[in-house]
Amino acid sequence: MVMLRSLLVSALAALAAGSPIAEPADQSLEARQLGSSNDLTNGACKDVTLIFARGSTEMGNMGTVIGPPLCSSLKSKLGADKVACQGVGGLYTGGLMQNALPQNTDPGAISTAKSLFEQASTKCPNTQIVAGGYSQGSAVIDNAVQQLSAEVKDKVKGVVFFGFTRNLQDKGQIPNYPKDNVKVFCAMGDLVCDGTLIVTAAHLTYTINAPEAASFLASKVQSA
């Protein structure tokens, strides 16, 4: 697996020209199981709506590394009947090559995420929106939030990033969005957070951060 990652990084480095890139999550059978949630698009409105974008090559629309654990932790803290979890699917394919684009993902992925924020605002006008992104998914959410109207952006109470691929470029925050409402998790040794193409084992460790991230989002919702 180490050799595979090295080959992928080497092959994409020339194309990326210094842009950070996320690599596949755990290749085990368990990690290949689908992880999806469509509480917003298919379910009833809840007090809180979590919109999450998975990392490159992760299955489903929530992935496996941190999406489902974050959803579960947030429901545990706020109540399962109070939280809707929605993964970003559609035009966001989680492909590796998209990491090399200027926004570290592609316009279709950003548009898909943006539409989910807007759907949450219109379908559920009283819901409080929170969001999260892992690896390439962090770039998806970062760019989507930047493009929201002031009205919708005001409903986004908190955002968490894991292995933030635009951490260096955007200085650990989302441009034109309150810095105090963003929490970035960068594991020690995760060089993706330093704006490099070097993917280490640390990039796959964010499952353990689910409770802390959920606590942060819950605190933003409760103080709103």
UniProtKB/Swiss-Prot annotation:
* Enzyme Commission number: 3.1.1.74
Give the disulfide map.
C45-C124, C71-C85, C186-C193
Q: SMART domains this protein is in?
A: Cutinase
**Which reaction does this enzyme catalyse, per its entry?**
cutin + H2O = cutin monomers
Which residues does the annotation list for site: Transition state stabilizer? S56, Q136
Keyword hit for Hydrolase: yes
Give the record's keywords alphabetically. Answer: Disulfide bond, Hydrolase, Secreted, Serine esterase, Signal
The signal peptide here is 1-18
Protein localization? Secreted
Q: Does the keyword Signal apply?
A: yes
GO annotations of cellular component type: extracellular region
| Pfam families on file | Cutinase (PF01083)
Major localization listed first in the record, in broad terms: secreted
Q: Which domain of life is it from?
A: Eukaryota
Q: Which residues form the active site?
A: S135, D190, H203
GO MF annotations for this entry? cutinase activity
Q: Which GO terms describe its biological process?
A: carbohydrate catabolic process
Bilayer-spanning residue ranges: none
Family listed? Belongs to the cutinase family.
Q: What does this protein do?
A: Catalyzes the hydrolysis of complex carboxylic polyesters found in the cell wall of plants. Degrades cutin, a macromolecule that forms the structure of the plant cuticle.
Protein name stated in the entry: Probable cutinase 3
